[in-house]
């Protein structure tokens, strides 16, 4: 599927629909509009919604946006059904044998043909009058088609209310104009959503992501201005359609894996191209009595991509077990698949996508009774904000009960449009209050009917989120704490303190809670949690209490076309298996297609050369901070077990922070040599020298062994001026000033570079330094610039910062003192000569060019 035409259509459609719907709002709200006379109830509902959304221009813009996406969803849904023959006649499409032309239902109407199951006789008469000229109109065909489109929307509301919901009865008043024009949204929907494109319901998800892409750009532009994300921004900022091969990996290695563990003889494996067979034998897994028990939830389901592929896999499972094909779709929707979402638009599309999956497998799916359709509709729940007033709580909470506890339960969804499925209802309390509500529901009190209805909604949402499932699968929202508004930030601190740095971490914990204690979590998230210190608690939890079944590491460039970053997709068993090995697969940074090819190759060869590694929880726990460094060699892993941390071998320290470098620092050539002192060995000697300026090691560019001797600092009279500049200045570890050291820069875009400094330097907070005996420092300089240390620091220092906490964890073997000093002397001599060949070195004598010229 080529996404570019879909994106072009969807982004254009949003702008076009908002413009047209806004024009219709202005027209129907005009003082003398015919709609005010013919549809006063709908006009009142429209005016109420505009006022609720902020009134005036703000309210009208909000309603226009809502109605625009409502019609976009309906038009693409109808086009999808037209293309697949699920409608008796093309509702938005020309006849199947035509690419262009008027919608088939309009062409039929011109011939006097109407579907009696859809079109009300009165509407048929009005349409006929418009088309034969007996009813006056400035746009008879356009008005006739508008009436037909409204009728078909009402008809499909019976079987798909989530997609064809009656929004206060005014959406029909706001049907976009010019739908029959050559370049209308209908015409472009038909040419973009070809029959080939509509073979897979995945197209619906891509269209929605592209439809909101402009809004997403607005939100991210706001982040750059330090704006925060709340309920209105989270869907646009976090909605990403997952590439199909990642969906397949996650679902096949969770839903498929659990079935294969229960039925090792199953031929389901033949259709799972991304299935990774267990490396070690497994005995501790969820036992299933039948397919109905293979329940799946996606707690951030978006437009339903995970669930639609799970539908395909489950259909194959039911079929293999001998179930009748005609009953399988209903069984899957009733027993197996569940999704929650905070975005109404995405939730509607997810339910639609699952309905299309069912209809594709069961021709009679839409011909069932209304009760059957209601009972077997997709279990997609848009988690809605619900709050009760004090008098309503008086009604819901009987006297003698703990009001504070029960009030908290009833109002737990107050901010559900922000927190969504991260809300964790208590299962026992949910069951208890569900029984209590049944009694209240029998109370014949019209004044309380709304309260009871909302309470029932609370129970429904709580029941979905309080139960456990065989599999939880998700591509959850990614959002760092810096983008969260105060409400969400505080919620994360209170409820998910171990993972408050990013929403995706909270969803890992939530997925664990939603999975059965022997079930599986399949999830794709960012990869920063694998190594940085702030996620150490999450790593410890996963390694101590659970076990990885398989892991894909997608480095450098995200698989999502809109995001730069990196991703980790993994399947986690809720059962702990610390010694059990799992496959960890490292994929190329060269884009989606290359990553997919890498995965296929790794699954065939299962060798490290193709990125396939085996590791267990114990392997990671041997390394400080337990980073997920599955690619580590056995020798390097052993070094962490046997060696001493560098911080126990040498004294590692941070240095001086002047707080005003412009005032206290100079380049050495900017000051008088007479006021400078080089080579002091102590603070006492420096003070006695009477000098003002002393060599200052502030890190600097990448340079090994020797160099970056450029700056001097005002340390006259033992730093009196800097001391007086407190509390802004920070004078750390002054007892080590002027001592010989091994030093390195705090920041490097690649590997760290370590330099040997002689006596005479004060060092900065960005020129981290290690101290000890001269001989030890020589050996450490050799060790830290070695390939061994480079590899160790790739594990220990996952960011561009090489602070002393990370470097101090480098394991030092007992034989470090056996390193050859002569080698260091050669390296220092070469690096020193290179540094001193520049006129910016205080050791400069003459240019090497002079020597070259002299030889010639």
Language-model region placement:
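A glycine-rich phosphate-binding loop feature that marks nucleotide/adenosyl-phosphate handling sites
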Residues: 229, 268-273, 370-374, 379, ...
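Short Ser/Thr-interspersed hydrophobic loop/turn segments at strand-loop and sheet-helix junctions
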Residues: 212, 697, 735-753, 780-794
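Non-catalytic DNA-recognition/assembly elements of restriction-modification systems
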Residues: 241, 301, 627, 633, ...
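Cysteine-dependent PTP/DSP-like catalytic domain, specifically the C-terminal lobe
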Residues: 323-348
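Short alpha-helical scaffolding segments that buttress acidic/His motifs in well-ordered protein cores
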Residues: 72, 76, 207-211, 503, ...
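Short, conserved secondary-structure transition motifs
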Residues: 338, 378-390, 556-565, 842-855
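Signature of N6-adenine DNA methyltransferases within the class I
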Residues: 2-7, 308, 315, 319, ...
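Preference for the N-terminal adenyl/adenosyl cofactor-binding alpha/beta module
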Residues: 1-313, 339-349, 353, 375-438, ...
